[in-house]
Structure formats: C-alpha cells, structure tokens
Amino acid sequence: MSVLNAETPWGALEIADAHVHFFSPAFFNALATQKPDAHDAEGVTKLLGWDNPTSPEALAYRWAGELDRHNVQRAMLIASIPNDTHSVGAAIEKYPSRFSAVYMANPLLPSPDMRLETAIREDRVNGIFLFPAMHHYSMHDPKVRALIQVLAGHPHSLVYVHCGVLSLGFRKKLGLPSPFDMRYSNPMDLHELASSFPRVNFVIPHFGAGYLREALMVADLCPNVYLDTSSSNGWTKYLTMQTSLEGVFRNVLNVLGPKRLLFGSDSSFFPQFD
C-alpha cells in the first residue's frame, strides 16, 4: 500500500493518529448491561444517536476508510472496555499496516499480567491504557507494577495513563453514574514507574487534562514520557493563567520538543463530524 500524505502548511506529511477509541460491539454490549431499559447494544446506540457496529472487522473497515478520507496513514486503536483485546486484535489482523492497539486494563481484575502476556502474543496489542481514577487504584499499587514489568519484556511497548479530569459524555447522555476518584489522577504518580522502566514508553493523553504543569514536570524528568493532544481540550478553563491552546502547544514544545508530543484526535464513534 502506498504511503498516505496529508497536505499541511509545512508541506506533505505522513500523519499518524495516536488516540482513536475503538467502540466495538463488546463496548456497546457492556453499556447495555448497565442500561436495562435500552435492552441491548442496538438500543444503546439508538439512545446515543450513533451507528451500531456489526462486528470488529466491519468497524475496522470503516475506520480504515476514515483514515483514507483524511489522508491519515496509521492509527492507535484503544479498546475502551477492560480486556477487549479480541476486538482490536481483529482490526490489526485485517489491517496490520494501518492499526496498532492498546487496551483498557484494570489491574484489580484477576490475573491482569497473564492477560497482558496473552494479549501481546495472540492479539498483537502494543500495550495498555490505564484509568486509575475510573477503577480506583494508585499507580503505586504492586499490581500496576506487575503490568509494567510485563511490558518491559517486550520491545516498543507502551502504556497510556489517563490523568486529570475524566468526563465521559456518553455515560452522561445515557444517565449512567461516573463514580470516579480524582485522587488517583495526578501525573506525578507516574514518575517512579517511568524512571524505573526506561524501556517502556508512557503516554499522558489530553496534555494531562488539567494537570499540564505536573505532566510537563514528569515528562521533563523522564525521556520515555510523552504527551498527546487529544480531546476538545476543555480542561484549559482550569489554567490559572490565561493561556490560549496555541500557548499550550508552544509551552509543551519548548519543554519536550516535537518528537514527544503526539497528535491524537480522540475520535470514537460514527457518524463522524468534520
């Protein structure tokens, strides 16, 4: 397949999207169990006004078309319920040159390290996405460390860690509670792990979602920590100094340089909005 290049003010560039949620049939089935009056996954998608994916393969086909439409060469897919490695694995099997993947891992579930080894070997995932505030655990928990130790044994592995404000619009739209705990949201909690496992790459999405200063401090100290640009960046309203989003980019680039700031769209559902 020929390489896709997007026309930009800086010329033709190869674009990769580091943050795409893969809302699979399993994702909507899981929501349906929390929303009994929706009856099933199709009922959930109707309430949300989204298209209902018929299979992981069909969803992968649609995402590949979306990448083509926007001249994006590759995307990092995120399996957005715990352990949904089969869905993203099916996407990678169908389009190995277009997709890589991480999956939501909850270290408090049984045998998370064994699940991760299996996911890397069988579903070809590249790593995990941790949501400490969602699942109520500390990044200092030994079970988290066990997962990072697994990743350290695999070249080019990575872990996304959601820090800062966590607000899921689809849960609000469905009237579902979001009992998150922001005590576990500080990027500073990554410092010891990132320092101890220099071969594992850590990604803090959304510029730290309100913890920009802390995210920059950790990334400045640890060369294996990256930030991504995903989301609407509504967290900027929490900045104590009036800074535009352009100013945020300049600040991050001044500290990290361009190679450790990843473009992410935070795309998730169909139909997409241009």
Regions found by a protein language model. Give the residues of each.
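Mid-domain alpha/beta scaffold segments of enzyme catalytic cores
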Residues: 1-146, 150, 213, 230
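Residue-level preference for alpha-helix termini and adjacent loops
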Residues: 14, 98, 224-225, 268
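Active-site environment of divalent metal-dependent phosphoester hydrolases
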Residues: 23-25, 82-84, 108-111, 165-169, ...
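Catalytic pocket-lining loop regions of alpha/beta-barrel enzymes
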Residues: 126-127, 140-262
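Generic intrinsically disordered, low-complexity segments enriched for polar/acidic and small residues
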Residues: 16-20, 96, 246, 260, ...
